A protein has these predicted regions:
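Charged, often glycine-enriched C-terminal and inter-domain segments
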Residues: 3-23, 66, 81, 85-89, ...
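Cys/His-rich short segments
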Residues: 27-102
Length: 259
């Protein structure tokens, strides 16, 4: 006989839990062997009787032309037995619904959408048939800072113009807590800084681990103080005489284009 039905449950975890591994308690309603009849389907004091149609085999042979086809017995529905006096609790099914709590282990590095299979924790089968499996679908909580990119962690870091030009040591969040990231002098907006080994472990190999990929964005203030404005105007005057290579190339092309 085939196994009991498989069940599916959804679990939502944080990115931090996905990186380190965790355990979760799942509450579900599943079919289990009836407590009144111990799964036999027969009322107390009675027993199922052997099906006369299939002689207890649960299958019958039917001739179709030159061939014989084996199929489930129509009298006992493939069980090989007939319940003449069914259990009142389960109406002869041998199963009843029960609320259960099942604790599962979620491995480090588990990916969103991955299905974890818990053997034998689905619906139990009637009359000794093995239970099906529990399929647990993993989902991620929305994170305030991070997003997963393969085994890497994507993170956007806003910095000031002066920090990008002069460089800075900045405290940033990681999956394992706070860490210091060195922003090199002359960092460009959109540049990716890599924090090695600060990503997710591979769910297939704990020895392999991704990185944290920090995309630097230069924040341009909408308002500045009088002192800041004066300093910026002085800087603008200097920039008119000291043009960088990329900007100089653009200005040369601009002049050439417009003659």
């Amino acid at each position: 006989a085939r196994r009991g039905e498989s069940l599916r449950a959804h679990v939502i975890i944080s990115l931090e839990a996905a990186a380190s591994g965790t355990s979760k308690t799942i509450r579900l309603r599943r079919k289990v062997h009836c407590g009144s009849c111990s799964g036999s389907g027969a009322a107390a004091g009675s027993r199922p009787v052997t099906c006369n149609t299939c002689s207890g085999r649960g299958q019958v042979l039917r001739s179709q032309g030159f061939f014989s086809v084996r199929s489930a017995c129509p009298t006992c529905q493939g069980q090989g037995e007939i319940i003449e006096n069914p259990c009142k609790t389960c109406q002869g099914a041998g199963l009843e619904q029960k609320n259960e709590e099942i604790e599962i282990e979620i491995p480090a590095g588990v990916e969103e959408g991955m299905i974890l299979r818990v053997t034998g924790r689905g619906n139990e089968g009637a009359r000794g048939v093995p239970a099906g499996d529990l399929q647990v679908v993993i989902g991620y909580e929305r994170h305030a800072f991070f997003q997963r990119v393969d085994d890497h962690v994507g993170f956007e870091l806003p910095v000031s113009y002066s920090q990008a030009v002069l460089g800075a040591d900045l405290e940033v969040p990681t999956l394992e807590g706070k860490a210091v990231l060195t922003v090199p002098p002359g960092t460009q907006s959109g540049e990716i800084l890599r924090m090695r080994g600060m990503g997710f472990p591979s769910v297939h190999s704990r020895r392999s681990k991704g990185d944290q990929l920090v995309e630097v964005t230069i924040e341009v203030p909408k308002k500045v103080s009088d002192e800041q404005e004066e300093l910026l105007r002085q800087l603008a005057e200097i920039e008119e005489t000291e043009v960088g290579a990329r900007r100089k190339g653009f200005l040369d092309r601009f002049k050439e284009y417009f003659g």
